[in-house]
């Protein structure tokens, strides 16, 4: 069962553990000692999207001497209340990790003008709201090149959770990368409508495998771990997302698209530390170190070289990857 979001933090916040709310003490360093809270859509140890944000925020808070608390498994319907609870409890900065946190942050920010709200992958900005959008389509493009180079059936599978902009751009970038190698390649797509239900992704992956897919990529948070399990069971290739996921499929993984939230959140929290914070939407990509692709030793050397060439050209600007939010057929 998922951990429930606990509301009413203003009445029951402690420095160690509040039912459902984890407060992480960090070693003091030179800084203002601000209180930072992080809201996650899944578990902080999901070996993916949420864990990279948790570890990135922890690292930045240690650097700037900030106190960190976090809440896991925040349902969309509870986001506004979770933001408000931390703000009313005296937290100086509240971070929402994911596109779905953008609109609630804008809503709550009006009531708490002295609190700064930071969102990832959202298009939200105000005097006290800043968003940081990663060019995940760039890493997806490279991953698509790899998949197209490794498939024997010319059928690829891509599994996402909910078709929001930040996920759609990944699936589209993946397809564009694959079709840069083979314009006739087929990319089968499935949306699980869940960030955490591994069984749904596993079932979607099995259906794709039955339909001839021999490489599966996911961008489905913890849910996507089920897709990787299906790939392992079927003996086909898979591709990780957000985090180094090689431990989930050591003999089957081709790569992991990494989202370096330590870079993103160091940038965000650093702007607060040096007084340069502005409520804008910022874009960070491969050239900034915000996204990258971790290549597996399972890849042949020629495919590694092809992937690295694409990475170098994206960083230099020779290859410009389109950010497409269109939900394709």
What are these regions (language model features)?
Residues 17-31:
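Sec-dependent signal peptide cleavage junction
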Residues 1-9:
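Positively charged n-region of N-terminal signal peptides that target proteins for export
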Residues 28-329:
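A residue-level marker of the well-folded mature domains of exported/periplasmic proteins
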Residues 9-10, 22, 297:
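N-terminal regions of proteins, emphasizing targeting and processing segments when present
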Residues 9-17:
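Hydrophobic core
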